[in-house]
A protein has these predicted regions:
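N-terminal leader/linker segments that initiate helical-solenoid repeat arrays
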Residues: 54-111
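An often Trp-containing, charged/polar helix-loop segment at the C-terminal end
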Residues: 880-941
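Non-membrane alpha-helical segments in proteins
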Residues: 69-80, 104-118, 147-158, 213-217
């Protein structure tokens, strides 16, 4: 083989030294950070959280076969000049000549992978890297196989698929559910064929640092911050080279962990565990201190090694840490302003690159007291660069730079950012600015859609276009744009939402408003009569599908993995109602939807058109629509009155008012002779109340006296079916003792012994695990041995605002986390082994906390059971035992549905004062505080 005149040495770990080897910052979904209450940055810091190795492992490489060497050499020149399309053309031609030469084909595929990444063509990059791995393996170059696996892992990680990255880098994933604050994650030895082990075996220090660095970053992206820090610490010990990259990633890892601990402190505060709040707050501040120091060190080392791109990343990370609320103490005003000045100076000197484009956008949208979410989802205020068109100039320059680079991904982000600037400009010359905003936004859409170069941002620009069109009073075009944004987001949502929940983008600021905007826009068109009568049903069906998708996304976001959607029915809600019209013939479905300032109710009945009504108060002066704030206050007041149960004779005033607002408008449609069961699919704060306790003042009846009542997060998640109840084996778990978990005392449940005895008497074939015998380990071992269709848990179950604070109290002051419960139940061997019914009789959810009740609503689906019977709040009284006993008797011995079995049990307690003493039911149990909190979730048949 004849070497080309210019042979470019393979450079493993210094990709920043030459222009053509600059790292492409592939924007992905999980590099965002959060502030309190899941405040994650989404596309705000467009490249700050740079992977530890920008693993274009250096430079494009020359192949050395005589006939193709000139093509390879020409491709290198094209690449070096930034003419990436021509580089692809020449290298593809060379590759065709290397079909029977795997050694040189591997080199060309390696080069193609890098240029495809420059062009934002990730699918092609993955194919080329996979081919390079195959070819290097064929010729026995195992060290290079390891390096290519690391590079492929980085691409997957950048695309929001860090678990695939971990599989390539190590082969095994640390199980977070088997670790805790006091029990660190187990040590994992990577498999022999993994990138990390290949590098170790061949003493490839640079390859080892690369694998460890990307591995650490991947663990950061799935929320395993302790594991991330461990790998990154190891990376800096293996080799002293390019510490600025490792330090930058360590800074991001500590910052992410600090934000998680800040979130946990807030959750502890809401749960009343103030000692834990103090502990998490202290740890959070310590992590922020470390992040600050690592960013400083990263900047210092980058300057010493004359690496302006790395210096830029460090500066912007430091600026963002300083601009976030509650972080200002780390950087005083003087240092903050100096750092911005330094960043602007470095930006000016950078060569044209992705870093220069994203850096300009970040600086342009830099805010004082940043919200921590994407600046493209709202109009930012308090821009730091607010004078002399500084921000505008940066954005316009970013557009010019992206065009020079011919990178559709960069073109998309730069035009989208500039379009958003004009969208948010003051109202003077409004028409002209809207035209400019739309022009640049449409350019962003075209670029993002070109070979799916930036599909992860396409929905942002479609959404942005919809908002601009709305301003121009082009409502139908706006809705079409919102719909395209929705469709794109639905397509990529699985990747966005399947990381651990604490590392996802800010769901509340990104997904939720888009879905609600689309639904409200369609309803507004219906309200003004813009849709003909024959089209109303179709439009309402679209609204239903949009809101259903939102509720699915909320659940996936809360639990942070894709298991909850494993049984998702691909059909839309209307199709499911039609397919199951016989099973659902006596069932009405009421879906609530909270929109801008008002709340609506959708009624669906099999084989009938969907109906919609805003919640209204006929006694209200002027506009009859009840504001969402008013409704939320009324809901909180209703629940508080139930939980406190201060009065022996319950005052039904609020319950009656809510009935009149929510149920009565549909009275003619849900007459009891036609509808026997009402299934509620609730939104937001409406999840926190038991609908069974609403009161019909005209009939002097609670809702549950007329209808069986159930709730489900979505019909698509667990389409109800009649189940075989012939197998009556029960696993009964209970805790009778007082327990202390994380500084919070859970009082003794005096009624649990009676409750357990009652369940044992109904299910003779049972296994009890009580008090110290009820532990996570014994629970798992028992399930491994025997199938139990029924699992009854009589212990405190706390549902927090994050899954980490969702657990069941077990013996020995320990807890069974929702993740452990899920793993235990999902590890059952087959569908025939699955749990049909999970009962939790002492659940606690925070008042007014819709995220906690979201956890309760999704628990059955999350842990893989068909139905959950659970309480909205704990009732420390014999009433639970009475209710459960009647429910199980009905469930086992009659042909009642699950909802009807619960209904009958609740009606029995409502009539407690009328029952003879021989029944043994305390007359005070007629108060809804005792029977209303138990709800049926999931399959109600």
């Amino acid at each position: 083989m004849k070497s080309p005149k210019k042979y470019l040495k393979f450079l493993l770990f210094k990709p920043l030294q030459l222009p053509f080897a600059l790292c492409v910052r592939l924007i992905h979904f999980f590099t965002q950070q959060h502030q309190k209450l899941n405040r994650h940055q989404f596309l705000k810091v467009l490249f700050l959280a740079t992977l530890v190795i920008c693993l274009l492992f250096g430079q494009v490489v020359s192949a050395q076969t005589q006939n193709a060497s000139l093509l390879v050499e020409q491709g290198i020149k094209d690449y070096d000049a930034g003419n990436f399309p021509n580089a692809v053309k020449h290298w593809q031609e060379a590759l065709n000549q290397y079909k029977n030469n795997p050694s040189d084909a591997a080199v060309v595929n390696e080069n193609l992978a890098r240029v495809y990444q420059q062009l934002g063509q990730n699918k092609e990059a993955i194919e080329s890297l996979s081919a390079a791995i195959r070819d290097y393996g064929a010729v026995g170059n195992i060290q290079q196989v390891g390096r290519m696996q690391s590079e492929l892992a980085q691409v997957y990680s950048n695309l929001g698929q860090p678990r695939k990255a971990i599989a390539l880098l190590c082969g095994k994933l640390v199980d977070k559910s088997k670790s805790s604050e006091n029990q660190p994650s187990q040590e994992i030895k990577c498999t022999p064929e993994s990138a990390e082990q290949i590098a170790t075996k061949y003493n490839d220090k640079r390859g080892q640092v690369a694998a460890l660095g990307i591995l650490g970053e991947a663990y950061r992206l799935i929320g395993s911050y302790d594991q991330a820090i461990k790998y990154l610490d190891t990376a800096q010990q293996v080799s002293p080279e390019s510490k600025f990259l490792v330090f930058n990633s360590l800074g991001n890892a500590y910052k992410s962990r600090g934000q998680l601990r800040e979130l946990q402190a807030d959750s502890a505060n809401k749960a009343g565990i103030f000692s834990k709040e103090k502990e998490f707050t202290k740890k959070s501040q310590e992590d922020y201190d470390r992040a600050y120091q690592y960013f400083q060190d990263s900047i210092k080392f980058a300057r010493n090694e004359k690496q302006p791109l790395a210096e830029m990343r460090g500066l912007l990370n430091l600026i963002q840490l300083g601009s976030q609320t509650n972080q200002s103490k780390f950087i005083n005003d003087g240092e903050f302003n100096t750092t911005i000045k330094d960043a602007l100076e470095v930006l000016e000197e950078l060569p044209d690159s992705a870093t220069k484009v994203y850096g300009a956008i970040d600086l342009a949208y830099l805010q004082h007291d940043a919200k921590g979410t994407s600046p493209f989802t709202y109009c930012p205020t308090g821009l730091v660069l607010s004078g002399d068109n500084e921000a505008l100039n940066l954005l316009e320059n970013s557009v010019l730079t992206s065009k020079k680079l011919q990178d559709n991904r960069l073109i998309s982000f730069s035009n989208g950012a500039l379009g958003h600037f004009w969208e948010c400009s003051p109202d003077n010359e409004k028409a002209l600015k809207n035209e400019k905003a739309l022009k640049y936004t449409q350019a962003a859409i075209i670029a993002a859609d070109s070979k799916l170069s930036a599909k992860d941002s396409l929905y942002l620009w479609e959404w942005q276009a919809g908002r601009i069109l709305d301003k121009q009073n082009r409502q139908e075009e706006a809705i079409a744009s919102y719909q395209r944004a929705f469709d794109t987001l639905e397509d990529i949502r699985q990747d966005i939402l399947t990381a651990e929940r604490d590392v996802q983008f800010d769901f509340r600021d990104v997904v939720r408003p888009l879905y609600r905007t689309l639904a409200q826009s369609r309803l507004d068109l219906l309200g003004v009569g813009a849709i003909a009568d024959e089209g109303r049903a179709k439009e309402l069906s679209k609204v239903v599908n949009t809101i259903d998708a939102l509720k699915l996304a909320e659940l996936q976001n809360y639990f942070g993995n894709d298991c909850i959607l494993s049984g998702l029915n691909p059909k839309q809600v209307g199709e499911l109602l039609e397919d199951n019209s016989v099973a659902f013939k006596n069932t009405g479905f009421l879906s609530s939807i909270i929109l801008d300032g008002k709340t609506g109710i959708l009624l669906q009945l099999p084989n009938q058109a969907t109906k919609f009504k805003w919640i209204e108060d006929p006694n209200q002066q002027g506009d009859k629509v009840v504001s969402s704030d008013t409704l939320q206050k009324k809901i909180a007041e209703f629940r508080t009155g139930l939980v406190k149960r201060e009065e022996i004779n319950y005052d039904t005033t609020i319950a009656s008012q809510l009935y009149d607002w929510i149920i009565r408008p549909f009275a003619e449609d849900i007459k009891p002779e036609k509808v026997k069961t009402l299934v509620f699919i609730q939104d937001g704060f409406l999840r926190s109340i038991p609908m069974a306790a609403l009161y019909d003042s005209k009939l002097n009846k609670y809702l549950v006296e007329t209808y069986a009542v159930a709730t489900t997060p979505s019909l698509r998640l667990n389409t109800p079916k009649l189940r075989d109840r012939s197998t009556q084996k029960a696993l009964i778990l209970g805790l009778t003792k007082e327990a202390t978990i994380d500084g919070k005392t859970f009082e003794q449940l005096f009624a649990v012994p009676d409750e357990v005895s009652a369940v044992e008497s109904i299910f003779p074939n049972h296994t009890p695990l009580i008090d110290d015998n009820f532990l996570a380990e014994s629970f798992q071992q028992t399930l491994d041995k025997t199938t139990y269709p029924i699992v009854h848990i009589a212990s405190h179950a706390q549902f927090g605002i994050i899954p980490e604070d969702t657990f069941i109290v077990t013996g020995k002051n320990q807890k069974l986390t929702i993740s452990q419960l899920e793993n235990s139940l999902r590890n059952l061997n087959s569908k025939s082994d699955s749990v049909e019914l999970l009962t939790l009789t002492a659940c606690e959810t925070a008042v007014g906390d819709d995220r906690a009740t979201l956890g309760l609503a999704g628990v059955a689906l999350q842990v893989g059971v068909k139905t959950a019977i659970a309480s909205l709040w704990s009732v420390t009284d014999q009433s639970t035992s009475e209710l459960v006993k009647t429910f199980y008797t009905n469930y086992r011995n009659t042909g009642m549905s699950i909802a009807e079995a619960l209904q009958t049990a609740q009606i029995r307690m409502i009539h407690a004062k009328k029952l003879p003493p021989s029944e043994g039911v305390n007359p005070m149990y007629d108060h809804p505080a005792y029977w209303a909190p138990m709800v049926a979730i999931g399959n109600w048949l």
